[in-house]
């Protein structure tokens, strides 16, 4: 066994060892001075493909393709926010299993990874927010917290250890199936779009639509920890960014979210647009969503910043 592999195993067992901390200091630049794993190549290749398709999109423009972009962005984006984030990561509401799985599958098509991977990373983010162990810590720079952290799986292991915080998802066959077959679903989507509308639908759907949604999601990790307003006393740098709320389906009320992590509602004021909450509320009204969590008045008073 090589010395390198021995060190990596020590990182995985104890991400707080001096060797692991020193490794974190050395590995800010994710494209060199490091060992690339197969998962890193897969994620980088997927990202490169999505952005390349987006750059090709102007050459294949049609009005119908523009509608495909809107549908892809909306279905995938709401899948991420309603399913991966509020339902699976924070358990802020419950729905029947058939609906839970359907929403998760919509999120999978946003090309942001499988539920187990996404939810685990997000739970670690809340556990270690803005610290050295935050998977996408803003302390390591805007571009790292925005996108570059995705391409270094070993660095994530050195920070947080193995994905031991998603046993609730690992116990379910559906999420294990998606984790093992995610690439086939994305490829299938590509062939389906090509069958319906050729390269026009592929470039505008999986290119423009997916790229926009990826960067809006990433702005929550980067921009919403750097710029914006604060309403609540949280032990982090989370911010509310009002102009991003429509595009993020309500996710950019990020200081609200970090103050009340388990809340299904993130736009806590009537004027704070939160499309994801409107979807959850609709499910609740028609009897599909139960145990919907929102902060109490006492909790809001306790967390409010006195001005």
Curated annotation (Swiss-Prot):
Residue interval(s) of motif Histidine box-3: 254-258
Origin: domain of life: Eukaryota
Membrane topology: Multi-pass membrane protein
Binding site for Fe cation 1: 85, 90, 122, 126, 257
Tissue spec: Strongly expressed in flowers, roots, leaves, seedpods, and inflorescence meristems.
Catalytic activity as recorded in UniProt: a 1-hexacosanoyl-2-acyl-phosphoglycerolipid + 2 Fe(II)-[cytochrome b5] + O2 + 2 H(+) = a 1-[(17Z)-hexacos-17-enoyl]-2-acyl-phosphoglycerolipid + 2 Fe(III)-[cytochrome b5] + 2 H2O; a 1-tetracosanoyl-2-acyl-phosphoglycerolipid + 2 Fe(II)-[cytochrome b5] + O2 + 2 H(+) = a 1-[(15Z)-tetracos-15-enoyl]-2-acyl-phosphoglycerolipid + 2 Fe(III)-[cytochrome b5] + 2 H2O
GO biological process: response to red light; unsaturated fatty acid biosynthetic process; very long-chain fatty acid biosynthetic process
Protein name, per record: Delta-9 acyl-lipid desaturase 2
Binding sites annotated in the UniProt record for Fe cation 2: 125, 225, 254, 258
Cell compartment(s), UniProt: Endoplasmic reticulum membrane
Family of the protein in this entry: Belongs to the fatty acid desaturase type 1 family.
Keywords, ordered alphabetically: Endoplasmic reticulum, Fatty acid biosynthesis, Fatty acid metabolism, Iron, Lipid biosynthesis, Lipid metabolism, Membrane, Metal-binding, Oxidoreductase, Stress response, Transmembrane, Transmembrane helix
Molecular function per GO: metal ion binding; oxidoreductase activity, acting on paired donors, with oxidation of a pair of donors resulting in the reduction of molecular oxygen to two molecules of water
Motif extent (Histidine box-2): 122-126
Catalytic activity, EC: 1.14.19.75
Record Pfam families: FA_desaturase
Pathway(s) where this gene product acts: Lipid metabolism; polyunsaturated fatty acid biosynthesis
Placement of sequence motif Histidine box-1: 85-90
Protein purpose: Involved in delta-9 desaturation of fatty acids. Plays a role in the production of very-long-chain monounsaturated fatty acids (VLCMUFAs) in seed lipids and in membrane phospholipids and sphingolipids. Is an essential component for cold adaptation. Is essential to adjust the acyl composition of organelle membrane lipid composition in response to cold stress.
Mutant phenotype after disruption: No visible phenotype under normal growth conditions, but mutant plant display a dwarf and sterile phenotype when grown at 6 degrees Celsius and also show increased sensitivity to freezing temperature.
Cofactor(s) required, per the database record: Fe cation
Enzyme class name: oxidoreductase
Transmembrane segments: 53-73, 99-119, 182-202, 204-224
Polar residues bias spans: 1-17
Entry annotated with the keyword ATP-binding: no
Induction comment: Up-regulated by cold.
